[in-house]
Each structure stands twice: as C-alpha cells, then as structure tokens.
Amino acid sequence: MLLDRYLPRIEFDSYEDFKKNYTVKTPEDFNFAYDIVDEWAKEDKEKKALVWCDDNGGEVTLTFEEIRKLSNKAANYFRSIGLKKGSVALLILRQRWEYWVIVTALMKLGVIFIPATLQLTKKDIAYRANAAGVEMIICIDDDYVVGQVEAALPEMDKINKIGLVNGNRDGWFNFHDEIKDFSDEFNRPDDDQKTYGKDIMQIYFTSGTTGMPKMVCHNYLHPLGHIVTAKYWHMVQDGKLHMTNSDSGWAKFGWGKIYGQWICGAVIFAYDAEKFTASNMLAMIEKYKITTFCVPPTIYRFMLQEDVKKYDLSSVEHWTTAGEPLSAEVVNKWEELTGHKIASGFGQTEGTVLVAEFPWFEKRPGSLGKPSPIYNIQLLNADGMECESGEEGEIVIKDVDTNPPVGLFVGYYKDEEQTKNALGSGIYNLKDVAWRDNDGYLWFVGRHDDVIKCSGYRIGPFEVESALNEHPAVVESAITAAPDPIRGQVVKATVKLAEGYTPSPELIKELQNHVKKLTAPYKYPRIVEFVDELPKTVGGKIKRASIRHEDSNK
C-alpha cells in the first residue's frame, strides 16, 4: 500500500477530525511516475492499472509493470530526439490508452506536458504552441486533428517533432514503431535532469473573461493534492474500477483518471467513445462492473432520459459529480432509481477538489458540501470581511503565500504579473459566489465572472466574440450564458449587425458555422439574438450581466 507513505493518518472519525488532522507528506523530489507508477510495479507486477475500451471493440488492460516498461521505452525515445527537463510537449489524445504511458514517460524526463482537446483549431494550436514553447506534439490519427496541426505548423516556432499513437502519415512519427526497439529500463536521473516537487510538471490552458487562455502551472507535488479528491470524495478502492468521464485535454482528467486514483491503488476505467450516448455509458457501467463513478451533471440528466432500470448498476457503490451545480431534482431521481445519492464536488483547473460532500455528513441536494482540509477556504464580502452564515460572498483560499496548499497551481506560465495578481496578496480569489449555512455547508450562487460552463466545458467569451466579430456582418457582439435544462448553460450571442445586413435564420446559421471554423466547435453560439445596440457601461464596456439578467427573466 502506497497511501500510508504519504498520509500519516488515513482513517478519520468525523468531518471535524478530517478537517483538523488531515496532513500529507510532500517529499522534496516527489515524482508521480517513479514514486507511484514504478513503485506499484515493484510491489506487485500483476497489479492492474488501466482497463481501456472503445466503440469499435478495442480493449486493452495494462498493469503498472507494463506501464513502467512502456513508459521507459518512451522516455528513452523522447530523450533520443532531444527532449529533456524543461522541454514542452502538447498532447491531443482524447482517451487513448497511450496517454497514460506517454505522460508517465514525460514525467520521468521532466518534460512539461500540455493536455489539449481534439476540438482545437489551427489558431488554438498555434497560440498554445508559441505561448508555451512546445517542441513536440503527439495526436490521435484523426483527419480533423491532423489537418489542424498541419495547417498550424508554419506558424509554430519551436516544433521539431509531430507524432501519432495509432496511425501512419507522411511527416509524422509512429509512436509504437519508434519506441519498440528502445530499452524498457530507464534510470531515475540524479544530475541536472532530476526533477523536484516544485518543478513545473503540467500546464493547462484555461479560458477567462478577457484576453487569450491563461497557462495554469501545476508542479510535481500536484498529484498528492488529489488524494483527497480520490480517497475521500470519489471514495475509490484499491483494486476496484473507477470511471470519470473526461477527455484527456481537460483538468477533470487529472481529477479522476490518473493521480489520486493510482496513488490509492484503484484501477482506471477509460471508455474512449467517439461520441457520447447515455445508453452506451450505462451499458459500460453494467458490463465492466464499475465501483465508483464521476460525471458532470449534464450526463446524469442525459442518463435519466434513458430507462435506467434496464441496466444493472448494482456494482456502483459511490456516485459523484462536478463541473456545475446539480439540481435537487436530479439527485432525488437518481437516488430513487439506484438507491444512492450523488455526492457533489467543486473546484477549478487551478486546484484539486476544494469543496465536496465528504462521507462523514449527510448529503444535502443542491449543496456543494464542505471545504477540503488542505485549503483554508473562506467567503469574503464586498468589504473583504469574512461572511456570516447566510451572507453571500466570494470563495477565496487564504494563506497561499505562507502555507501554499499542496495541489493548488503555482502560477501562470511565463507571466509573473498575472501570477502576482492571483497569488501575491496571499489570498486566491476563485471569482465564484456562495453562501454558508449554519451547519457549514456551502451553497453555490453563481460565477463572479462571465465564463460559461456548458456540458462540463469552460468557454471564455473573448475567444468566441473574437471569432464572431471577424465576420463582415458583425459590428460587435456579446457572448453570455443562457439557461438550458439539459446542458445547464448554452452559449448565446447577442449581435449588432453591420449596415446592409438584416436578421434571418440563414444568417444565424452562417454565423454559427463561421465560429465553428475559427475556434473549437463546442464554443459556437446555440442562440443568436440581433439587437440595435448592446448594453454598455459609461466607460463603454459591454454589460454582459444585463443580458444574462434579461434572459433569466424571460
């Protein structure tokens, strides 16, 4: 058991006991690849790590020993092509099983990796590559993805290798062909290539309300922060299958498909579906006898539209959700059908689970739960004072300078000013608003900023507005969230047209297709409204809140 190497105490009698006494050891040179993956392989060469399947009948089961050997081969290959500590790689791999092998190899080398979604466009890819100094891209063999990468190549400054995990194309290396003749042994570096806990391990690009996506940095200690996520919220079990539904390009993947789960000895289940259907997901749960399960609220809503009673879901002992608030209606209906309540969790790309419905207290449908013990979470009012019970305030994490929480991001890559603005005061503001009841439960009110959460995706208005405004028919636009009963929120565009253009269904379709071509397709506005003028402040800023308020009252 590896967990007891990092937790002085694993079992707790109550939430109060957990909050007060939970601690995690953070070795100076902790590296997830060596200290978790390779150590599990050393303890038990037959211990399962991953069960993977796809829609085409493909199935792969890997032990930690197999991942150790494959990742060593990959690390030796990557080193042979010039990658080293501090190099940067971009990965567009969906849920291919090779992702786990590749990131393990990159961690062993100290190569910073950037997980990315396959829906990125040429513009998205070029921006990410140049902003982070990417030297290698590895993708799935998908016509769209390959086409976007190849189109972006002339605009990327440092790329010297592009590869595929499941195919052959001119100009691309085949991952399997390249690594097969390399040694399956790789010695942990003890020279200037050695990694330390405070070194940058991973970067996520995350959308904000202004500017281009920010580069959120996590260091090598970050996986240890996810012990709380996996052990005490997901409730994973050693040797049992855990399923979180997430593309490898999203932070949710790190929450539920690798770090905390493997530290706890759980087996990751990955269903690499080309297109989500609720019936297929329910069938996978039944077929593989999943023990613990986590998906966004939208997926629970879709599954409830199926005949859930048709499926044997009795293997699942714990259901969880995160990404957006979950209504009491869904929680109650799910309990009626399965006998289990869904435990909510709350957090950000910048951290691990921050607030959750932990096992020591009753679940209250609609609540976020209570704070994780590794964060000093408070609610602050407009005056910067801690809120009383029942008073709304912004969720903040205190003491991030004097007592940095393990798992919290360490800054924005190559941007000292943004890092100082976010963390320099010692208080990290999540820009989310909530209130606390008399029993300590937090209840989500809404986002302070304008980021849209649609079906688990985070969508920044600036990127969509920039794309939309490139169309000649558009003078200016505002992107906001509109309520949706299935997705929670959908993207809405409020548009002021240029002279000579008139509103029509055909123009709406044209604008939607225009956005799909310029940015990731999931960001396109499902609702388009034409107006004579956009609401603005005296200073000329668009008042998106006014649009949202008007939509909520319709």
Question: What are these model-derived regions, one by one?
Answer:
Residues 45-48, 163-164, 169-170, 180-205, ...:
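Conserved pre-ATP/AMP-binding loop-to-beta segment of ANL
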Residues 46, 50-104, 121-126, 174-180, ...:
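Conserved AMP-binding/adenylate-forming core of the ANL superfamily
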Residues 60-65, 194, 201-225:
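Conserved AMP-binding A3 loop
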Residues 104, 108-180, 289, 499:
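Structural core segment of the AMP-binding/adenylate-forming
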Residues 120, 127, 137-142, 293, ...:
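AMP-binding/adenylate-forming catalytic core of the ANL superfamily
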Residues 224-241, 248-291, 306:
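Conserved AMP-binding/adenylation subdomain of ANL enzymes
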Residues 263, 290-294, 304-364, 376:
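Gly/Ser/Thr-rich phosphate-binding loop
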Residues 374, 385-421, 459:
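Conserved ATP/PPi-binding loop(s) of AMP-dependent carboxylate-activating enzymes
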